[in-house]
Amino acid sequence: MTTHTGTPPTPASPPLHLQGRILPEGEVCDIWIADGRISREPVGGSETIASGGWILPALVDAHVHLGIAEIGGPLDFEVLRNDLRHLTHSGVGAARILGSPERLPAHMLSRPGEPELLTAGVPVAAFDRFIPGWGRRVPDRLLAPACADEARCGWSKIIADWLGPDGGYGPSFSAHAIEAAVSAVHGIGARIAVHTQSSVAGARAAAAGVDSIEHGMHLPPSALDDLAAHSGFLVPTGFVFEQLKESMLDSSQPADLRRWFAEGLENHPDVVIGARDRGIPVLAGTDLPVGALVDEVVWLHRSGLSAHDAVGAASWTSREVLDLSRLRHSDRADLIWFAHDPRDDLEMLRSPELAVIGGEVSAAAP
């Protein structure tokens, strides 16, 4: 029998208990939640809130920008709070913020009842090669120290290519500068992500040993070989580019820009398949706007990932790759529950029947 209470507990409620098939393994297990943490051992006096059904580690948006009221504008804390509420009630228990107009306050990164946040500080870009008003602008020789400085919360991000004055999309930094940045960030125990939408910059980033490639529409097969060799991962954010298709291919756009975008859009599923075939983890990320994570999961499935791997890209795979809680004993309690297997219908992911985020029940169907 598949049941859940549908009633969020009060702050004084007892420890919680769930029983169901836990993905990705699919084995029937019991989970207890006490003091905001997972217990794989029975906890006395617990209240059963779900029995039967399917339990997943809460969703993860592996590439998102929160608190953005307008492109190029400052960080808006009211928008940030609204974004966090939306993610929480959508069953998203963690998000990797890959670049913000300013650094997020440390006290916001892991709070009970809200998603756990990984952040890359302010993205590091070349002069005149990023969105006006955003980014930390540096010349080639200062890329490495800037990236290391921004990596104080565990991640740094390079805008490795951008639109140039000629209307083309090409590298912003030399191969040597990217190699030095990777070495500097890894030297302090942090990781580095790279925005790339050109084959040259993508190849340079992968060869340098970056930890993640973001977008990568034009990533060549050789770059995927290097990414695999360095145990990197891919976050394609493909759905956002599908949404931009009409405007980017409009006849009012420069011909070179239209060609670049059309070729990248056509190549993007092949990049996903190439990553899959090389054993490179593919994670689900939305970029902007907030709230399209399930659309990205659907896009990944349509682009060649199995339903199992597409769901994993927004759940257990992301959590393992990003070293987030994933239903182990003493992990932070972040999970979602469904009466039926969401791999059979990805649209189910839009409305978790029960979500526990940061140890607190945040969503429950009546």
Predicted regions and their residues:
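Hydrophobic faces of well-ordered beta-strands that scaffold small-molecule active sites
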Residues: 58-64, 95-97, 118-121, 156-158, ...
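Acidic/histidine-rich helix-loop elements
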Residues: 66-77, 127-138, 165-171, 246, ...
